[in-house]
Every structure is written in structure tokens, then in C-alpha cells.
Amino acid sequence: MKIIAKKDLFINDEIRVREVRLVGLEGEQLGIKPLSEAQSLADAANVDLVLIQPQAVPPVAKLMDYGKFKFEYQKKQKEQRKKQSVVTVKEVRLSPVIDKGDFETKLRNGRKFLEKGNKVKVSIRFKGRMITHKEIGAKVLADFAEATQDIAIIEQRAKMDGRQMFMQLAPISDKK
């Protein structure tokens, strides 16, 4: 049963049809009933009459405790939101003339991000006349990708964007 929000449902007195296909509390079919009879059955069972499929011919209504149903639905939605993993993109900035020690520090940070399941954007900013030596920047990015190939795959190859060259890495577990 696909029910999205209260605005899609008509409850008790909001229902404006002559007859409904009635579904009982346990999901059993009670047949096609006039609206007045369906509402009296709902009142007798001390539950709500909820129109769950208004487009059907005749519309389908169900006897249910709407408050409990709404609570369960919200609980299920909350649980689904918890299960969703939010992937963030972390950035590691390098320079085309980066020293070995600095490179290893940035590499360590990048590996840490990847191990936590985050994507990593590795960027190199070219300053001044460094832009004429794009191959040096490409080599630095290639070294970074090679050093992380055991835990990451290249999601986006190295490309230039203005005075910046960047590539994006994703943890291998994402693609399996």
C-alpha cells in the first residue's frame, strides 16, 4: 500500500463518495458497501474509515486506527532516513611543486577520508606561470591516484577548470 501523506487521504467525514470497496481491520475484503454502512462499521469497531485508493472504481476504503497508522508510517520513514548513507566530498588541495613530505601528509588525509567512505576531490591550483606546466600537475595527480588505487577508484579523470586541475576519487566499496 503506497500512502504518502495526509493530504492524499480522506478520513471519516471527509469521504465524499456513495459507495466504497471496504477492507477490514485485518486486511480482509468486506465487499462493496454504501458509505453510510462503512462508516457505521467503523464507528462500531471504534476505528477510522480511511479512503486509501480514491482513483479505483469503486474507491477503496479501509478500517484502521489512523493515529496508529500515521505513527507507524512516520517511524518507518525515520528509520529509512537513518539507513541512508550521506556521501560527502572532501577536498585535498595540492600544488604542482609539492614537496615529498607534504605530499605524503595530504595523501594520508585523503586515504583517511576514503576509508571513512567519503569521496575525495584532489585539486591542484596553478599560480602565476605554473599554468604553462600542466604536465607537472597531471603527474602529481597521477601519483596520488596510484598511491590510493588499493582503496579507491578514479570517478572523474584529471581535467582542467580555469587555473585548477582536479580529479575525483571514490572508495572501492561504493562501486561493488
UniProtKB/Swiss-Prot annotation:
Descriptive protein name: Translation initiation factor IF-3
Cross-referenced NCBIfam families: infC
GO cellular component: cytosol; membrane
Subcellular localization: Cytoplasm
A molecular function (GO) term: ribosome binding
Keywords: Cytoplasm, Initiation factor, Protein biosynthesis
InterPro entries hit by this protein: T_IF-3_C_sf, T_IF-3_N_sf, Translation_initiation_fac3_CS, Translation_initiation_fac_3, Translation_initiation_fac_3_C, Translation_initiation_fac_3_N
Protein purpose: IF-3 binds to the 30S ribosomal subunit and shifts the equilibrium between 70S ribosomes and their 50S and 30S subunits in favor of the free subunits, thus enhancing the availability of 30S subunits on which protein synthesis initiation begins.
Family membership noted in the UniProt record: Belongs to the IF-3 family.
Alphabetical GO biological process terms: ribosome disassembly
